Design a protein with these regions (language model features):
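Non-catalytic interaction-recognition regions
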Residues: 2-105, 116, 120-562
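Short, charged, solvent-exposed linker or helix-capping segments at domain edges/interfaces
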Residues: 106-111
Length: 562
């Protein structure tokens, strides 16, 4: 939380405890051990700027009704030397505290002093956390679910970083197993269809996308029909060796264009090459957590909350995808991460329990793995669902989206709804350059402040640091409401980190822009007496700082003019 908010909470606790002790000494309250109580910021500011349940929390200790306890506390309450100018009781014993100008002055001073660091905290205590997200199969182009996952994962990682975690972003490339076998088969058949008189047909469960045909044609253009004269195994190996790196390179290019920068692209094939997949089987076997049946190696998943035991190694000697997944998560812990966050599509919900159970099986706590399930995306145009790209006539891919929609809009709009909610992405809204587009609305607030500052500087007015007395001139409801919102930014970051919910920050900054526009329409800056003008300029600069910090954190551009 911001320093001023932290001080205010501490002051409420201190004056309540002092008043209780004073009331006990005066015989107004019986002698008792002081109880624990909470100090919160009410959602409804008519209930005060801070509120405490101290009277209700101490009812059992004092054996008195909360309203009587509250009355005794109020009679002995001393607010001198605090941020607060008054306190009052409400309801069944709540005590509400109202802030004075010193708090508002300190908030603005703190924002301008900390500048780009405002909002950051040590809440995470530098714990090492890995956020693994997108992790799309490299067998085809990335889709809208990957677009949402990219924005969600990257912005969540940034929120965690701001909250004091040591964050690592990772993309797990599934370049092994059944999906890759299917990829090789599909490429081989498409390649043969270019040259053979009676080529094989694609099986129903193979990849039918045009991207597969495009890769086959590209190989044929470079190498001709040379693979028609080799074995099927050699043909598949050559085509996978040609197509897979191209697909991975395209995925990396799309993510870079999307402003998603990973610390590592981790290849599943490396787990197999390094022997880590079979090593995890041996690890579980040594712990007595496997058995053999029908020639396969089984893991006793039911001992860790699973509905059924799971195959680790098939009868043909090949490990399952689940085995590789366990090995990958063990690898993460072996690299020293304290907390793992995976973002999966909601269609993987059935795998959550068995994956968390496997964490216990490898000697870790299931609580160290958090899995966020993300709902699907529906693209909308003219109020109707749309699946095909206007430009290509094919299914819309991430690359297509980024060609049509500004990256700023995509990153912001994909974080407008919580992960567990279906999201309608409005393609028309995303390209609008007006206040209907939420990211434009927020960016415009920042640009408007920059415009105000430029206009005044052109007239010879230079913003300066204000005294507490000058900042005390900010008394209009719109001014105080805006400062209160600015003061809550650090708490919002911490809350978003706790809940794994960057959407909370998206909503926060939209509301900040709304409160700024409301302030600007109600309170003149230019033309006021110099001290008041400078105080309002300070409020403008503080608002711009917070907007800039949010947009920068989300890797969205921060325009100074629009």
């Amino acid at each position: 939380m911001s320093k001023a908010v932290s001080i205010a909470k501490e002051q409420v606790s201190a004056v309540i405890e002092a008043a209780m002790k004073k009331a006990m000494a005066a015989g107004m309250l019986p002698e008792a051990e002081l109880p624990a109580f909470t100090v919160e910021r009410p959602a409804d500011r008519s209930h005060g700027d801070f509120a405490t349940n101290a009277a209700m929390a101490s009812a059992r200790a004092f054996r008195m009704a909360p309203p009587k306890i509250a009355a005794a506390i109020m009679e002995n309450l001393d607010l001198n030397g605090t941020y607060f100018v008054k306190a009052e009781t409400a309801g069944p014993g709540f005590m509400n505290f109202f802030l004075g100008s010193a708090f508002y002055s300190d908030v603005l001073t703190e924002v301008l002093t900390k500048d780009s660091a405002y909002g950051r905290s040590d809440y995470g205590n530098h714990r090492k956390v890995m956020v693994e997200f997108v992790s799309a199969n490299p067998t085809g182009p990335m889709h809208m679910g990957n677009a949402r996952g990219g924005a969600l994962g990257d912005c969540l990682a940034s929120v965690l970083d701001a909250a004091g975690y040591d964050v690592w972003r990772e993309f797990y490339v599934n370049d092994a197993g059944n999906q890759l076998d299917k990829f090789g088969l599909s490429l081989s058949i498409r390649y043969q269809q270019l040259f053979a008189e009676n080529p094989p047909e694609l099986p129903e469960d193979s990849y039918h996308g045009e991207d597969i045909l495009d890769l086959a044609k590209e190989y044929a253009k470079e190498h001709g029909d040379e693979l028609m004269h080799v074995t099927e195994e050699e043909r598949r190996k050559a085509l996978v060796g040609f197509g897979l790196p191209k697909n991975i390179a395209k995925m990396k290019a799309d993510m870079e264009k999307y402003r998603v920068h990973y610390d590592r692209w981790f290849l599943e094939s490396d787990l197999h090459k390094d022997g880590e997949v079979m090593a995890v089987v041996d690890y579980l076997r040594d712990r007595g957590l496997t058995y053999e049946k029908d020639g396969a190696v089984w893991y006793k998943a039911t001992e860790f909350g699973g509905e059924k035991d799971e195959v680790l190694v098939r009868a043909n000697g090949n490990p399952t995808y689940f085995t590789a997944d366990i090995a990958y998560h063990k690898n993460k812990f072996d690299r020293g991460f304290d907390l793992l966050i995976d973002i999966w599509g909601s269609d993987h919900h059935g795998h959550v329990a068995r994956m968390k159970g496997a964490m216990n099986a490898i000697g870790q706590s299931a609580d160290k793995l958090d899995i966020i399930l993300m709902q699907f995306v529906r693209l909308m145009r003219d109020g109707q669902p749309v699946r095909m790209s206007k430009r290509t006539g094919k299914a819309i891919q991430l690359g297509d989206l980024l060609d049509e929609v500004p990256v700023d809009s995509a990153r912001f709009l994909f974080n407008m709804r919580e992960a567990n909610s279906l999201l309608d992405f409005d393609l028309d809204l995303a390209v609008q350059q007006d206040s209907q587009n939420p990211v434009y609305y927020v960016q415009y607030a920042h640009a408007r402040i920059c415009s105000i500052l430029r206009a005044l500087e052109a007239e010879g007015v230079t913003p300066r640091n204000c005294t507490a007395e000058e900042l005390a001139l900010l008394t209009a409801p719109e001014e105080l409401e805006l400062i209160q919102h600015i003061a809550s930014y650090t708490d919002e970051i911490i809350g978003a980190a706790k809940d794994y919910d960057p959407v909370r920050i998206t909503r926060y900054v939209i509301e900040l822009a709304t409160k700024f526009h409301k302030f600007y329409n109600a309170c003149r800056v230019k033309g006021e007496e110099e001290s008041l003008m400078q105080a309002r300029l300070t409020l403008c600069r503080a608002t711009a700082t917070v907007i800039r910090n949010v947009l920068t954190m989300f890797n969205i551009t921060v325009p100074t003019s629009m």
